[in-house]
Regions:
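Non-catalytic C-terminal accessory region of glycerolipid acyltransferases
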Residues: 2, 27, 52, 65-193
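Catalytic core of membrane glycerolipid acyltransferases/transacylases, capturing the structured
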Residues: 6-65, 92-101
Length: 193
């Protein structure tokens, strides 16, 4: 599918070993680039260390604030990309665009992955990790849509939320429960049209 569309978007939850994307180049065709979107750390030494760790197997780090620009540049250079985004974190209050019920809680989701998918018209996959034993996981790529521009606003993000909820209900211990998922309340956020 990367060959056909020039790229794909991978929606990745904080589930099991979510850092698997850093080694994804080993399962991609030569020349395809696994792109990892990340939020730079305030401590420049820790940031440099994490970037070094996450790129040692051929991954390409892109800072969250320059995602669209970097992906467009890679595509203009005729690079095929698999853009991996961990999308179940709580966004900043001014980035709180999509609210839904998730695990029986009013929950805001980041919608940056959906925006990138629509901008580039890249197919979108939900990445489900299944623990196979100590130190082993299997990743299943479930197609959400091959035509993101044809979807309604919020449809891709909602689909991600529903699939993640199913994954968590099936095996709750592997979700990263400690990342303050419900710290934002609707009344504390800027509402967008």
């Amino acid at each position: 599918m990367i060959e056909k569309h020039g790229g794909i978007v991978l929606l990745i939850p904080h589930y099991a070993n979510f850092e698997w994307i850093t080694g994804m180049s080993s399962i991609m065709q030569e020349g395809d680039i696994p792109v990892q979107i990340y939020k730079p750390l305030h401590n420049k030494y820790m940031d440099a260390m994490f970037k070094r760790i996450r790129t040692r197997f051929g991954g390409y780090n892109v800072a969250k604030h320059s995602t669209a620009r970097e992906i467009i540049k890679l595509c203009r250079d005729n690079k095929r990309v698999a853009v991996g985004m961990i999308t179940d974190q709580s966004p900043n209050p001014n980035e709180a665009h999509y609210w839904t019920t998730f695990l029986n809680q009013d929950t805001v989701f980041m919608d940056g992955a959906e925006r990138i998918a629509k901008l580039m018209d890249f197919p979108v996959f939900y990445c489900e990790l299944q623990k196979q034993g100590r130190g082993y996981c299997r990743v299943r790529f479930d197609l959400i849509t091959e035509t993101p521009k044809a979807t309604a606003d919020g449809e891709i993000t909602e689909c991600f939320a529903r699939r993640l909820e199913q994954t968590i209900r099936r095996e709750p211990p592997y979700w990263f429960w400690s990342h303050k998922r419900w710290k934002l309340k609707r009344e504390d956020t800027i509402q967008h049209g």
